[in-house]
Amino acid sequence: EEGKSAAYYKAAMSGNDRRADGSLIPGDALFVQKISGITQPLEEMCPYVYEHAYSPHLASRIEGHPVEMAVVRDGYRAVCDKYDYVTVEGSGGILCPICFDEAKIQLEDVVSELGLSSILIADAGLGTINSVVLTAEYMKAHHLPLKGIIFNHYHPGDVMEDDNIFMCEYMTGLPTLAKVQDGDTELKMLSSSI
């Protein structure tokens, strides 16, 4: 919406490159900045940035900087206090381990702790039906609200992809919020749908 501020947040991101000074570049956040045009500082976007391209629980253990839920929560609240709209990206799927020490944090714990409603992002291609339905059923069983599905890598008129979308909607009861083609730079979606 015009005149509103937007921001991005992700609890943990792994597989990041280093700058010449040795600091890590939060790659996903940098990509979001470039594509969306938001001016939010990178350091607000993600409290945990790891070099190793592993699940966050393993990257954090190797790098000696485990995720703490309080840090994730406080960072999210600070971003929410500053911006009108905040999009939170998951780290892997809903069952992805974020920390596996005494805390045993999975992505579902982050979603629950932050009180988030979710949008399921799925590939439109082969194999998506099982993945989408299992994720949706798991989230429903654990009382994690889902608003709908966005399908990526969509090819208009592709018989299999169109059927995948139909089957996902039918089997989950969730609406398709958008079909995103490779190279799309705008997402046409009503804010009321999210």
What is the role of each PLM region?
Residues 1-66, 70, 77-78:
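N-terminal phosphate/diphosphate-binding loop that engages ATP/GTP or pyrophosphate donors
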Residues 7-11, 42-46, 86-90, 120, ...:
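General beta-strand structural signal in soluble alpha/beta enzymes
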Residues 23-30, 137-139, 165-168, 194:
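Short, hinge-like loop/turn segments at secondary-structure boundaries
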Residues 44, 72-82, 104-109:
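Short, charged beta->alpha transition segments
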Residues 56-58, 82, 86-88:
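Long amphipathic N-terminal alpha/beta scaffold segment
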Residues 58-62, 186-194:
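Short, surface-exposed amphipathic charged segments that create phosphate/polyanion-binding patches used
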Residues 85, 90-173:
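Conserved catalytic-core segment of NTP-binding enzymes
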Residues 169-188:
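Beta-strand-loop-alpha "switch" segments that mediate conformational coupling across diverse proteins
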